[in-house]
């Protein structure tokens, strides 16, 4: 079975679509939207409940797209933690497109965030508008924007701390 899944080329994003369905065209968070996007933010370390714009206005931004069930996403958070302190003028935001509800609560998400050392804005985007706007086709996925919100780099899979630094040095 595992070989069959690997052979089918399923990525984190396609698994999400299989679990949650394709966003409907009428959904305001549907894939047709561009950037910036507004996401709900959660009360968790480094994050407060409310909303945030992705990318952040007037600041270079590292956008991490993840899922709690994605083991490689844990590794991505470690890379981000390793570089965050070196870039105080850069906004960091992690966004999941998982649907918060019966099987995953806000508390579950905050607990996962705490266990994985997240210390910056944590957002949810159940309509996958952010994922679509960045053209993400796998998780984890990292995008870096400049202060004008223009995408300057993207990376599918785990971006190492060295890769993040190299890309961030172009916008700071």
Task: Please provide the spans of the model-predicted regions.
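Aromatic-flanked redox-active Cys/Sec active sites in thiol-based oxidoreductases
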Residues: 64-70, 97-98
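Short pre-active-site segment immediately N-terminal to redox-active cysteine/selenocysteine motifs
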Residues: 59, 66-69, 138
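Short, internal strand/loop/helix patches
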Residues: 110-148
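Structural microenvironment flanking redox-active thiols in thiol-disulfide oxidoreductases
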Residues: 74-116, 128-132
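A short beta-strand-turn-helix
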Residues: 35-60
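Thiol-/selenol-based redox modules, centered on thioredoxin-like
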Residues: 146-172
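Structural recognition of the beta-strand scaffold that forms the well-ordered cores
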Residues: 64, 91-94, 121-123
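N-terminal targeting signals for export/organelle localization
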Residues: 1-42
């Amino acid at each position: 079975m595992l070989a069959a899944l690997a052979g089918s080329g399923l990525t984190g994003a396609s698994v999400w679509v299989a679990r949650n369905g394709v966003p409907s065209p009428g959904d305001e968070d549907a894939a047709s939207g561009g950037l910036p996007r507004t996401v709900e933010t959660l009360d968790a370390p480094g994050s407060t409940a409310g909303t945030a714009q992705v990318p952040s206005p007037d600041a270079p931004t590292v956008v991490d797209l993840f899922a709690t069930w994605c083991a490689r996403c844990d590794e991505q958070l470690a890379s981000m933690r390793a570089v965050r302190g070196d870039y105080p003028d850069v906004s960091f935001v992690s966004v999941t497109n998982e649907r918060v509800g019966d099987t995953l609560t806000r508390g579950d998400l905050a607990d996962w965030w705490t266990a994985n050392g997240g210390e910056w804005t944590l957002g949810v985007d159940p309509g996958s508008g952010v994922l679509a706007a960045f053209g993400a086709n796998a998780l984890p996925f990292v995008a870096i924007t400049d202060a004008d919100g223009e995408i300057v780099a993207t990376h599918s899979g785990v971006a190492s701390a060295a890769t993040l630094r190299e890309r961030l040095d172009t916008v700071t």
